[in-house]
């Protein structure tokens, strides 16, 4: 069902891509890239369990991961096609129920209406199978882009999103979404971006009423659960001897179902620097503060799906080229979060070493 839905969601976009590619442009310039990675990992929390002071954490486990990626771009006289696809797999030794297969893809077709205005369509899909977080995330949007010069770029988009969470179908939702992205480059090293997105989420279940003693009666309310997801923020980027990035994002999820509302502030930073012996160091970290006005009724697994790996994280990677197309890489990452009121905590560390091939 989901794979069929993915194909159907991309069918209109594929038609537009073909129409644009078959335009009056006599020829097109094509470019592409391939990338593959193989890594050995040590995972301290493969099942992604929450624990407290009285609960023993899961055992450490080894895993082997493979990742393949392909991307391409076609440039015509007044049109451009961009696409990418990734396929990843992870195999554990002890926690074999956490073995995963992840696919993701995105396509974009744009057409210039003049020297500074353009329109286009884009679509994306991600499908994760296996483990405790099996889901599919689909979306298509149309956008209008304004770029009067190399300094300023503004994109406004509108479309629809569908999310399917297999372990708990009550978390499935769909609905329209709109967004805006603006970027201003002060010079070749400094740039500032602002962004905002809003998604109306309609679920197939009834909303939860406020429990007795909190201003309402227990049980379910008539109608369907409806959420509004708002995200807004800004980011600064510096490109020089050291690459730096700093992002602040605010997210508000308001729901007519009791216990599903949350507000989140998140700050993230990343850096990259060249070290001696042709070694590159990449580092990334994030801190989050989340408020739950009604307390928590959200499933911890769903929280991790939304945030990918929890609220707070720190990771680092060292890479050194062995040849023109092969790199040796070593990485470490830690992710953690804490749920208020019940004192449950989530902590996970992953160590890895492997190779990345590029073409």
Model-derived features: positions:
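Bacterial N-terminal signal peptides that target proteins for export
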Residues: 1-13
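Gram-negative and organellar
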Residues: 27-359
